[in-house]
Amino acid sequence: MYPSRNKRGSYFNQRRQYSRNHVWKRPTAAKRHDWKRRPSNTSKPNDEPKMSAQRIHENQYGPEFVMAQNSAISSFISYPDLGRSEPNRSRSYIRLKQLRFKGTVKIEQVPLAMNMDGSTPKVEGVFSLVIVVDRKPHLGPSGCLHTFDELFGARIHSHGNLSVTPALKDRYYIRHVCKRVLSVEKDTLMVDVEGSIPLSNRRINCWATFKDVDRESCKGVYDNISKNALLVYYCWMSDTPAKASTFVSFDLDYIG
């Protein structure tokens, strides 16, 4: 019997009418079924470590990050190694969440640059820091990363909007450009650079994978990355002799 509802909102039970000659039969016993799921002992334990959110820090500075007039440098962001000590990764892939960078650029005039009257010339130039995603990382016959000119056509293009050359667009794409137009009247000038680049969001995830051929090669270096390496290109263009020294810290947030 199911309760019915009248117009006032109260409930009453409708009485079923049975004939007087109705013979009642004792209901037979029915098997009771337990539909609740019970834990199964046949499931195999998952020995694979759980992925966790981590952050890896890296500083790029030193003699190899000093640029002369109208020159460029190519570098890459190191990924975590496969291992137990953090920051690490537990599998042959990681999810890239966000890349932050912060640092300084020091512009120094070359002592040989001097006007006829003995005064120091004014330095005007453009400094660029470009983050590029390499979909299919591998080194060419030269054993080096693609140069700034090979990837963007020419260093002079840093004065305008940079774009990857048509021959390399299937492999590379620009993720972020930090540009500073500088005018230096003194011997030296310090400039701050800072940026934050989201690599994954709710709709799209950016995964990096590794070759990990053997135990000794399970590193986070460029040569061991098989998909989505992060490259950094520095470029310094000036009309008078001057050098640019960079000290930039990178923090990569990832799940691995």
UniProtKB/Swiss-Prot annotation:
Protein name per the record: Nuclear shuttle protein
Motif Nuclear localization signal boundaries: 81-96
UniProt region (Interaction with Arabidopsis thaliana NSI protein), positions on chain: 150-187
Cross-referenced InterPro entries: Gemini_BR1, GV_A/BR1_coat
MF GO annotations: single-stranded DNA binding; structural molecule activity
Localization of this protein: Host nucleus; Host cytoplasm; Host cell membrane
Compositional bias (Basic residues): 17-39
Superkingdom of the organism of origin: Viruses
GO CC annotations on file: host cell; host cell cytoplasm; host cell nucleus; host cell plasma membrane; membrane; viral capsid
Subunit structure: Binds to single-stranded and double-stranded viral DNA. Interacts with the host nuclear shuttle interacting (NSI) protein. This interaction may allow NSP to recruit NSI monomers to the viral genome and thus regulate nuclear export of viral genome by NSP.
GO biological process, one term: DNA transport
Topology term for the membrane: Peripheral membrane protein
Function according to Swiss-Prot or TrEMBL: Binds to the genomic viral ssDNA, shuttles it into and out of the cell nucleus. Begomoviruses use 2 proteins to transport their DNA from cell to cell. The nuclear shuttle protein (NSP) shuttles it between nucleus and cytoplasm and the movement protein (MP) probably transports the DNA-NSP complex to the cell periphery and facilitates movement across the cell wall.
Entry's family note: Belongs to the begomovirus nuclear shuttle protein family.
Region (Disordered): 1-53
Pfam family, one: Gemini_coat
Keyword DNA-binding in record: yes
